[in-house]
């Protein structure tokens, strides 16, 4: 539901699934969806020294969408191949982490499918920082130290294994308040072993932001979206299952085709994913190159796929049909044997693993001498003769080999991709190139090729090879012109200035798109274009290869079957993408440039004002507040249950107050959601008990911690309701009216810990202005005290200083930034003058009651002090006694004071201890309305 993705409104029931499109309409009016600069990063976009890394509108949108002010916990970034998803994630992390020491996340965690992608991501981050701050006098050591302390990288599988070995408590303590980025998030499938571990880990974190990067969120079925949805949910109760998805979120209709069922999204599908997605298709339409799909369209019933066909040799045809004639129980459901044969049949008629073991070296992945001789057909033969001989075993490999060699000799780079490496796969094609005289490695230009697979290269070697291949000097293949790649380069890798891309058939189009996108992406052909001498765009040629058998035209080979299956799946996926785009968040500035009209979505920003930022700032709460919880609860136990009354007393709130539980919830909820606290306790409010657990598994089974009261005007003020409702509850006189009637003082909030007073008061005052329907500041001043000075900020600072004491310093609200800052020295005299005026007024009130003394109560320690009423306004005095603790007065003096206010102390022979006398004095002064709260009870405060 949208409310799970956009928790903008306090709710009474967490299981309610109410939702409306109007909520998303309101959200998109804010600057996060319209601003062209990063809102909260300290970096100015104009400082960029490298224009190629200047953020684009769709990247800024995501970065601003996940700021500390935003209530959004996570988003699926479905941006097409080549749109700069890596930089999008980098900007989002920086925009959040650098937004403020007490607001943003503490660290970034990047999880990638493999180490090659991880190194590529890390290099992009390093390059961005060095380019970004090259004029900030930061050396490499300073940058490396900052990055190593702030950003952590790991592969998905390695981190999942770490999660499985680590307790929940340790994981929460170590990783709470983390900005998590999962690259190629579609690799986390429901059937995989890593998904439940990563999903459980994210559920542990009470404070986190999550970005899931993917260009192809669905590979085979629409239900591939299930893990992406669940990874964003903070509670497991909000997760959905594949069965629920297929039942409620899509309609399924069996096709006459042999490939797959037709799936269509429902309205419930839109509701589930609204607000969770940022959608942007691939930017090939506006790329600087023209994409040419080589081959024929419409072959073998394929409607959209352009393929290059290769007719089987006689040996391949016989082997292929013999392999397909076996019993079904003996067949691989993925037709792996047929796929191997379509690639290559070895000279002895074997294929796949059997032929590889005979003709290839298992340790090195290189061909045996015997195999090379067989491929060459003898010594002294020409290239044409070798290719003709290779065609007996694989017409496809012979055709591709000739194509890439001819291209290399023209100064054009090529990429050949295959998901099968051993068997009849990529390493056998490498053997064909070696038979033609090419060498593995680099340095010989058109005579060199690289084989980027984990079977023959380490990850560092692959990263180094990619740098050489992408280097400016290698734009025309001067060092190496041909690159062979497996799944290790299928995602998250950039191949620059590739002119020819050769790919094989896949069971889904998503993998094919990912592979093609390695060489066609943003700025991928910048060097080629810089050297281009024509007004026409350079061409990039894409070859989708398929092996057929012209001898049996009524039989479709496995390659044709795979392409047909991909087309059928593409229909379903395109329908789901259109549905996602209709409820996706898009920035207005990117619509005309990147997003096709059908994909622009119905929600774009409008009504932009300078004040249009999401109005959610967490109160300034520090760990000292949590320290008090530690004193009350013994967290060494697995579970702790304490009565609500005990917790209320901890905060000096009267348990008999009608509104005490309401205030308690506001405080506890604020603590739970604050990103900088590392609260590793799980709090549940249920009736008259507060349960706290260190075990999140048990906490998951408990009801969600929600407002224990019904809010009014929830839909009247839109986004402001969350903020204003909280502010209203904080400053409302009714919140503790029952508890405060007997005191006669103006201090309901002063009974809370000082740091909480400051944070809640600052939040309340920050809501002042035309968008404050509750008139928060004026109500606060009216309730807590008035002043003749018309400056609201100064009055707020005076009240805050009076409440928290001089040691906390004076703080005022900066009307331009909307944040609280230390009081400028020029304003300190005004604050002190007003503070003295307030104290003088208090003294005069006591004189009007004909009292010589009044009581002072410390809000946190509950110490009771007695202060003498001065006959003159306490000004121009170096030091004023704020009041001694009552129990430190002499017995005779206490009896005298008690008699002055009408307390019977008995005759001179009666004996009463000082504690009893102090209790009687406090009770009497409370009846007279002569007890105030002050944190300076029992100490001296110097005044200059």
Curated annotation (Swiss-Prot):
Designated name of the protein: Putative ATP-dependent RNA helicase
PROSITE patterns documented for this protein: HELICASE_ATP_BIND_1
Cross-referenced SMART domains: DEXDc
Organism (species): Heliothis virescens ascovirus 3e (HvAV-3e)
Binding residues annotated for ATP, in chain numbering: 79-86
Cited Pfam families: DEAD
EC number: 3.6.4.13
The Helicase ATP-binding domain, residue ranges: 66-235
Keyword hit for Lipid metabolism: no
